[in-house]
């Protein structure tokens, strides 16, 4: 029995059907009356048509088989390609596992799910690559500054199929993306830092910040989110150039304002401007004491501020010009006062009379004249500093001379040893004065040495009120020596007079002198006279007419004696070691009495 669906059963069923149809056809032919030739012809035609149908079916089956083979091969190639692109190495193809036991359709059905899965993985991987590449290209465009052009190119590049979709390649893209993101962050921070610096500089300079940064790139001052901040190299370079430009402008304005404020201070000080008038410029006065980098107050270097200060300087300059003569006279007076204090002769080229004449005639700019006087004041101050040690020694010497003068007057006081009020104080002072007086020669010698050293160092003479100090000191030493010699001669003559008086008393006896009452010391000075001029006058402090050698001149009295200097009218007269003038006065009176006995006139000279 034939199995249903088997090829033999199909062939048997076909033959049976064909035979039945052939018998029915032959029966029809008989009824029609077809000839045998016609029957053979139609049978041959029928057989040919059947063969054509079989052949067509065979061809269709062969084509179907070829297509299946091609599909299987294509799928295998696609699987291999997807696995290679995705970098999948742990998946085996079902076709390769069982090559002979399965039909083509079974093989195709077995590999289709794997292909679908690999296709899904590829799409997801391509999406990851697309996202990363989009971010990379966007950041690269922001860095390079050509974002619009790169966005168009990015859309084209993303449509192309990616050949390498492995995780290794994806990690490389991600690493590159992170690098670009870090660079973007650094650039953004750098741009923001530059923008903040520009903002600070614009604030100090009083410049419009929005216009300044917009000139570099419009995105730097946009409040909307339509365009992100540009971080390209050109923007960074533009900001750096703008910062350098603003710093240069700040330096220029700072120096200009500093000069103007310095001029303002100078005018304030010259014109004694009250503090309330200076207060309104208080915010700019600290510029003189500050460095450029520390200037941060908004608008402090704006053109308006500089113009405001400049206007004030111009106003004060005009006022100064009208008061310049007064200022010149004032500074000249200060110069003369300083010269008086330091005993230095002022420069006569800027004297009050000459300065007034020059200003009135218009031959000299008052500012130049004032600057010249200021220079002289500074010069006097510097010279006074170098003269300080010598001037201190001069003061100590003059103080010793004052003590010597006091001791001279003290010795003329007949009541100096009385027990009256203050007597013991004067005795102590007299002792100290004698010690000080003994140091005067050493003081003078040291002062001469110091002065000569100063003159050698400074290469000029040390002048005291216009007279060379060394000459004054040498004259002082000479005069002091002459006085010592005069006193010595006086003492020798006094001894001879005492001896003569003793001899006369032994011969004639002592007799009261009728002139003793007139020999007492006068209030205005002490004068010793023997009636015949043989006894030289002793030094005294009163304004009694005496010769120059009898008076020791200090620097001040020397200047007044030789130069008639109006600044120094005080005459200091010094003596050497003091004598007992009271005792000498009494003895001189007695001597005069006895001398008058042998003279034809009461005041006739002694008869040797």
UniProtKB/Swiss-Prot annotation:
It is found in: Nucleus; Cytoplasm; Mitochondrion; Cytoplasm, Cytoskeleton, Phragmoplast. One of its GO terms (biological process) is cell division. The modification Phosphoserine is found at residues 513, 604. The record marks 419, 430 as: Microtubule binding. InterPro entries: MAP65_Ase1_PRC1. Residues 526-535 have a biased composition (Polar residues). Forms a dimer. Binds to polymerized centrally located endocytic MT. Residues 501-565 are annotated as: Disordered. It comes from the Eukaryota. Its main location: nucleus. Belongs to the MAP65/ASE1 family. This is 65-kDa microtubule-associated protein 6.
């Amino acid at each position: 029995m034939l199995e249903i669906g088997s090829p033999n059963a199909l062939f048997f069923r076909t033959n049976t059907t064909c035979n039945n149809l052939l018998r029915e056809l032959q029966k029809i032919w008989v009824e029609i009356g077809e000839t045998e030739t016609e029957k053979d012809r139609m049978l041959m035609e029928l057989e040919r048509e059947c063969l054509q149908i079989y052949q067509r079916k065979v061809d269709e089956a062969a084509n179907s088989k070829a297509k299946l083979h091609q599909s299987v091969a294509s799928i295998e190639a696609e699987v291999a390609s997807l696995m290679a692109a995705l970098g999948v190495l742990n998946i085996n193809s079902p076709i390769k596992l069982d090559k002979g036991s399965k039909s083509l359709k079974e093989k195709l059905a077995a590999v289709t799910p794997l292909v679908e899965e690999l296709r899904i993985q590829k799409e997801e991987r391509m999406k990851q690559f697309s996202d990363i590449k989009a971010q990379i290209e966007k950041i690269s465009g922001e860095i390079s500054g050509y974002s619009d052009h790169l966005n168009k190119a990015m859309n084209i590049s993303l449509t192309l199929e990616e050949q390498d979709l492995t995780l290794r390649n994806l990690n490389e893209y991600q690493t590159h993306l992170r690098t670009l993101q870090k660079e973007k962050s650094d650039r953004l921070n750098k741009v923001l830092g530059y923008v903040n610096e520009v903002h600070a500089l614009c604030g100090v300079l009083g410049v419009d910040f929005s216009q300044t940064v917009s000139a570099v790139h419009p995105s730097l001052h946009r409040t909307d989110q339509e365009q992100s901040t540009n971080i390209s190299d050109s923007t960074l370079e533009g900001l750096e150039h703008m910062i350098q430009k603003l710093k240069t402008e700040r330096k220029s304005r700072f120096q200009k304002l500093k000069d103007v404020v310095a001029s303002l201070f100078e005018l304030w000080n010259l014109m004694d401007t009250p503090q309330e008038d200076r207060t309104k410029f208080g915010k700019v006065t600290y510029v003189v004491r500050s460095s450029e980098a520390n200037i941060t107050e908004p608008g402090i270097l704006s053109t308006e501020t500089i113009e405001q200060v400049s206007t004030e300087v111009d106003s004060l300059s005009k006022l100064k010009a009208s008061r310049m003569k007064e200022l010149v006279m004032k500074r000249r007076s200060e110069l003369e006062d300083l010269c008086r204090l330091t005993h230095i002769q002022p420069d006569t080229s800027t004297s009050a009379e000459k300065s007034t004449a020059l200003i009135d005639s218009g031959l000299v700019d008052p500012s130049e004249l004032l600057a010249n006087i200021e220079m002289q004041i500074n010069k006097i101050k510097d010279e006074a500093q170098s003269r300080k040690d010598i001037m201190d020694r001069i003061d100590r010497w003059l103080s010793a001379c004052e003590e010597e003068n006091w001791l001279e007057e003290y010795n003329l006081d007949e009541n100096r040893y009385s027990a009256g009020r203050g007597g013991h104080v004067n005795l102590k002072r007299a002792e100290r004065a004698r010690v000080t007086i003994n140091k005067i020669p050493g003081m003078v010698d040291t002062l001469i040495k110091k002065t000569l050293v100063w003159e050698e160092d400074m290469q000029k003479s040390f002048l005291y009120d216009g007279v060379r100090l060394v000459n004054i000191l040498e004259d002082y030493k000479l005069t002091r020596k002459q006085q010592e010699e005069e006193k010595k001669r006086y003492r020798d003559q006094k001894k001879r007079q005492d001896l003569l008086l003793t001899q006369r008393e032994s011969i004639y006896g002592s007799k009261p002198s009728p002139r003793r009452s007139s020999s007492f010391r006068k209030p205005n000075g002490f004068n010793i006279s023997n009636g015949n001029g043989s006894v030289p006058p002793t030094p005294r402090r009163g304004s009694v007419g005496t010769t120059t050698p009898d008076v020791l001149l200090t620097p001040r009295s020397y200047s007044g004696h030789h130069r008639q200097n109006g600044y120094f009218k005080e005459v200091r007269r010094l003596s050497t070691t003091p004598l007992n003038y009271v005792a000498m006065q009494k003895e001189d009176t007695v001597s005069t009495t006895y001398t008058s006995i042998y003279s034809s006139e009461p005041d006739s000279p002694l008869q040797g």
